[in-house]
């Protein structure tokens, strides 16, 4: 089983797809990595030679920020925005959409579940 950046790649998948299990590598970046290292994209992970696995590992570590480093970098960027008090930082802190989307309706993913507010109760009528 190939292990890159602390992640075990699934053995029965094609290398092209298996690389996308790494945080920070999607399909297009995976194809680019395979083209630059000369590894056949149709090879299954279990059929990778040790040289191919080593070539993939060294190329990825040398050229890309993935997994924990990338997550840390993103967190630090958001923290920087919050610390300097930018509009984007305030939106992150408030848990609202950051990129100008509307919030009167929608934005449920960012704002969380809907909180129902109880309506005004009717006073019992006097008879």
Swiss-Prot record:
TM region positions: none
GO biological process, one term: translation
SUPFAM superfamilies in the cross-refs: S13-like H2TH domain
UniProt similarity note: Belongs to the universal ribosomal protein uS13 family.
GO cellular component terms listed in the entry, alphabetical order: cytosol; small ribosomal subunit
Species of the source: Gloeothece citriformis (strain PCC 7424)
Molecular-function annotations in GO: rRNA binding; structural constituent of ribosome; tRNA binding
Chain positions covered by the region annotation Disordered: 92-127
Entries under InterPro entries matching the protein: Rbsml_uS13_C (IPR027437), Ribosomal_uS13 (IPR001892), Ribosomal_uS13-like_H2TH (IPR010979), Ribosomal_uS13_bac-type (IPR019980), Ribosomal_uS13_CS (IPR018269)
Full protein name: Small ribosomal subunit protein uS13
UniProt keyword tRNA-binding present: yes
Ribosomal protein in keyword set: yes
């Amino acid at each position: 089983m190939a292990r890159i950046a602390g992640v075990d790649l699934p053995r029965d998948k094609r290398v092209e797809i298996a690389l996308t299990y790494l945080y920070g590598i999607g399909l297009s970046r995976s194809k680019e990595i395979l083209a630059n290292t000369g590894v056949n994209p149709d090879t299954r992970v279990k059929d990778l030679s040790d040289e191919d696995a080593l070539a993939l590992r060294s190329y990825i570590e040398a050229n890309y920020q993935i997994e924990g480093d990338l997550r840390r970098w993103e967190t630090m960027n958001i923290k920087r925005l919050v610390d300097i008090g930018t509009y984007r930082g305030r939106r992150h802190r408030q848990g609202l959409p950051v990129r100008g989307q509307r919030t009167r309706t929608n934005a449920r993913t960012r704002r969380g579940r809907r909180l129902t507010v109880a309506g005004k109760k009717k006073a019992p009528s006097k008879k």
